[in-house]
């Protein structure tokens, strides 16, 4: 799966609310998409695990291979694999720009980064997956941050964002059972 460019409301109807994915809301049709959507079935255990993995992929805008790579890196750490995985995803540069309020959605933040509008510690960075660290200073050109709710690990002044402390699981804007994702990638053998 490459970066998803298709209908976003269909994904929201299937997986539930994904705040960074799009600003659109499924107000006309609230059910599951598809011809046989009215026939609700109980999800199997595997379907629940796969749905958790897909939520992470769509929310953070990454591919299956990228998520597997993050999982392998998180598995090497001494901390809990699931929490470490979420921390790594949360500190991606495109996500930090989105959470700081410089972009309305994650794809818009990714575009800001790719088009060279973001500097980290004075150096232009065009890689959306750049891993931000504590005390990194991120500068966004000619954009004013919105009055969105800032997470406690970010500090915003004018066009500058600073990560002041490591990410905690409680501060995430997105709820997912990370243990299901860990179980999926352990089973797959990533």
From Swiss-Prot:
UniProt-annotated location(s): Plastid, Chloroplast
UniProt keywords, alphabetically: Chloroplast, Plastid, Ribonucleoprotein, Ribosomal protein, RNA-binding, rRNA-binding
Main location as per UniProt: plastid
GO biological process, one term: translation
PROSITE patterns the record matches: RIBOSOMAL_S4, S4
InterPro entries per the UniProt record, alphabetical: Ribosomal_uS4, Ribosomal_uS4_bac-type, Ribosomal_uS4_CS, Ribosomal_uS4_N, S4_RNA-bd, S4_RNA-bd_sf
Any GO MF annotation of the entry: rRNA binding
Described function: One of the primary rRNA binding proteins, it binds directly to 16S rRNA where it nucleates assembly of the body of the 30S subunit.
HAMAP family linked: Ribosomal_uS4_B
Assembly information from the UniProt record: Part of the 30S ribosomal subunit. Contacts protein S5. The interaction surface between S4 and S5 is involved in control of translational fidelity.
Record-stated family: Belongs to the universal ribosomal protein uS4 family.
Protein name: Small ribosomal subunit protein uS4c
Source species: Cyanidioschyzon merolae (strain NIES-3377 / 10D)
Lineage: Eukaryota, Rhodophyta, Bangiophyceae, Cyanidiales, Cyanidiaceae
Gene symbol of the encoding locus: rps4
């Amino acid at each position: 799966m490459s970066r998803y460019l298709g209908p976003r409301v269909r994904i929201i109807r299937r997986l539930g609310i994904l705040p960074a994915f799009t600003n659109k809301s499924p107000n006309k049709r609230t059910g599951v998409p598809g011809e046989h959507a009215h026939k609700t079935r109980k999800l199997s255990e595997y379907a629940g695990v796969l749905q958790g993995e897909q939520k992470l992929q769509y929310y953070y805008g990454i591919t299956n291979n990228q998520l597997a790579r993050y999982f392998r890196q998180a598995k090497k750490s001494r901390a809990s694999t699931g929490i470490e995985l979420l921390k790594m995803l949360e500190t991606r540069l495109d996500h930090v720009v989105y959470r700081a309020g410089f972009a309305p959605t994650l794809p818009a933040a990714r575009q800001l980064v790719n088009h060279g509008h973001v500097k980290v510690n004075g150096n232009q960075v065009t890689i959306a997956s750049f891993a931000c660290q504590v005390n990194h200073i991120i500068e966004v050109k000619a954009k004013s941050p919105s009055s969105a709710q800032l997470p406690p690990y970010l500090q915003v002044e004018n066009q500058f964002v600073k990560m002041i402390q490591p990410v905690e699981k409680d501060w995430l804007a997105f709820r997912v059972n990370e243990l299901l994702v860990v179980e999926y990638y352990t089973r797959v053998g990533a």
